[in-house]
Amino acid sequence: MGKEPGSTKFQTDFRRHLREQNISGNLVHLLCEIAEASKYVINAVRTGDLGVAGTSNLYGEEQLALDVLSDRILRKRLMYSGVVCNIASEEMDEIFQVTSNPLGMFSVAYDPLDGSSLVDVNLAVGTIVGIYQGDNLLQPGRNMVGAMYILYGPRVSMVYSVGKGVYEFTMNHLMEFTLTREKVQMNPSGDIYSPGGLRKKYTPENEAYIRYLEDKGSKLRYSGGFVPDINQILMKGKGIFMYPALTDSPNGKLRLLFELNPMAYLIEQAGGAATNGCMPILDMQPEGLDQRAPIYIGCKEDVAKATEFLNGACA
């Protein structure tokens, strides 16, 4: 099991911790650059404009000023990091090429401010990041070399993995990240469920699964924000988040490249599972930036039970 917050013998800063993970210097630098960018994003969240930017993204969604500002912060940090060749953002229409030479470089897919519509009611939001070696972003998430999210809540926490377990860092009063949890692990099953989407639009299989969870006494915990809901399941080590196929949206709502792959990577690294109901999220082949998929993510046994209810829906 992962250690509880404060159980480490001394505070460990993020850069020093990364250097102990036996990863490349370029990857250490990239992760630290993203962590630095998050300090400017949280400042924007706390003090920025809550109005509408007057533009829309690739999906036709109206962009909030905070979305645009957060995207600009992250994109510029990545562009000038010196270790990134391609960038894809949920707020951009196409892949942005920083350099045509991918040697020793990384490609980054990110959602700069997931759940930004929750900021004006003061609920938690977050940044989600997936990192790939080389210049190919349209490959299965299984090939990622790292993933992370930063949660902007009552505390600012950063959760990351480079394939060596899941670690949580928390921003202190000096705006530096210090290690608070090591080797975070999921339990086999749990009693929390976070169901997204309008229930009256659930398919019969998904409705039956929700009733199963209710009958066994699982507690409903859903904030409307993907990052805080996943963080709750991961840090408590129990439960399942689901945003299923809906009758009018067979591919669900969440984006494979920007949201699902990074979270699936982190949950699997913690001993959990993530599926679209038919196959692991990390084994899906992205066909474009705008690809969406249903998701069931959390404890292995809870995810396996969901697939049992969906058996036959994959044909």
UniProtKB/Swiss-Prot annotation:
Ligand binding (Mg(2+) 2): 111, 114, 259
Pfam family, one: FBPase_C
Gene Ontology annotations of biological process type: fructose 1,6-bisphosphate metabolic process; fructose 6-phosphate metabolic process; fructose metabolic process; gluconeogenesis; sucrose biosynthetic process
Enzymatic class: hydrolase
Keywords: Carbohydrate metabolism, Cytoplasm, Hydrolase, Magnesium, Metal-binding
Origin superkingdom: Bacteria
Places the protein is found: Cytoplasm
NCBIfam families given in the database record: PRK09293.2-4 (NF006783)
HAMAP family noted in UniProt: FBPase_class1
Record protein name field: Fructose-1,6-bisphosphatase class 1
Source organism per UniProt: Trichlorobacter lovleyi (strain ATCC BAA-1151 / DSM 17278 / SZ)
Taxonomic lineage: Bacteria, Pseudomonadati, Thermodesulfobacteriota, Desulfuromonadia, Geobacterales
